[in-house]
UniProtKB/Swiss-Prot annotation:
Source organism of this protein record: Neurospora crassa (strain ATCC 24698 / 74-OR23-1A / CBS 708.71 / DSM 1257 / FGSC 987)
Biological processes per GO annotation: ribosomal large subunit assembly; translation
Single GO molecular function: 5S rRNA binding
Protein's gene: rpl-5
Protein name: Large ribosomal subunit protein uL18
PANTHER family in the record: LARGE RIBOSOMAL SUBUNIT PROTEIN UL18, RIBOSOMAL PROTEIN L5-RELATED
Length: 301
């Protein structure tokens, strides 16, 4: 096939069509988004909810979002830094924290809808693959709250943390259509899920194993990497109980606030805080006074 050089003439520029801004910035996969937000036309005004999972360097952000013409509407949200209220102070971006944050979001959503007693999900995490099913009520069969996983631009590798967040939300009582083949412990050859491996990840067992290995092999690095764990007297064998207690506390009160959390600052307080670091422009009189001070200092020398 012959090579055709791209000629950027006036016709090229007059017919050029720019991509969406968030595509140009590399923030949104519109191919996936189109399929996630398109609702069946026979469902009329029923919103289609997405479980949006995003990771930052120090936090995990989970939201239940529906799309409207005017923009996306957030129905509920949960952040991994909120886990401090439930006793999880460290490792707020690992697999176990992702699961706990997913569980927190699910319980919040169902509490908000008044469905927390109808759909309890998996009360004691066992690592088994299970989808939330319809529940029998006094008024007949009640279908569960349904959401679709939205991973954004994250890689969907087997064992990725996004699936930890999804598993937590699923065990919390939300119906999220998924299969078991992306969870840690899934064997591609036998096509079976090892529930014990998945359970280990849910309760931070993989972190505990690494802590023990590092403590034996390189104590100096262990003290450096797990410095805050050591300060709080948190050892490898105590992680499972810590996460189990946190899961129970989340189910008991999904809207709990951390005790150390200070009251929110007002708009005026934030403004004063920002002005503290902003260098204000000097007036003409102040500049002249400064010049005179420097002249006086030089003369005194």
């Amino acid at each position: 096939m012959a090579f055709h050089k791209l000629v950027k003439n006036s016709a090229y520029y007059s017919r050029f069509q720019t991509k969406y801004k968030r595509r140009r910035e590399g923030k949104t996969d519109y191919y996936a988004r189109k399929r996630l937000i398109t609702q069946a036309k026979n469902k009329y005004n029923a919103p289609k909810y997405r479980l949006v999972v995003r990771f930052t360097n120090r936090d995990i952000i989970l939201q239940i979002v529906s799309s409207e013409i005017t923009g996306d509407k957030v129905f509920a949200s949960a952040y991994s830094h909120e886990l401090k209220a439930y006793g999880i102070e460290h490792g707020l971006t690992n697999w176990a924290a992702a699961y706990a944050t997913g569980l927190l979001l699910a319980r919040r959503v169902l509490k908000k809808l008044g469905l927390d007693e109808t759909f309890k999900g998996v009360e004691e995490a066992d690592g088994e693959y299970k989808l939330t099913e319809a529940a029998e009520t006094d008024d007949g069969e009640r279908r569960p709250f349904k959401a679709f996983l939205d991973v954004g631009l994250a890689r969907t590798s087997t064992g990725a943390r996004v699936f930890g967040a999804m598993k937590g939300a699923s065990d919390g009582g939300i119906f999220i259509p998924h299969s078991e083949n992306r969870f840690p412990g899934y064997d591609m050859e036998s096509e079976e899920l090892d529930a014990e491996t998945l359970k280990k990840y849910i309760f931070g067992g993989h972190v505990a194993e690494y802590m023990e290995t590092l403590a034996d092999d390189d104590e100096e690095r262990y003290k450096s990497q797990f410095n805050r764990y050591i300060e709080d007297d948190l050892e490898a064998d105590g992680l499972e109980d810590l996460y189990a207690e946190a899961h129970a506390a989340i189910r008991e009160d999904p809207f709990k606030k951390a005790e150390s959390e200070a009251p929110k600052k007002t708009k005026e307080e934030w403004k004063a805080e920002s002005l503290k670091y902003k260098k204000s422009k000097l007036t003409r009189e102040q500049r002249a006074a400064g010049v005179q001070e420097r002249i006086a200092a030089l003369r005194s020398e």
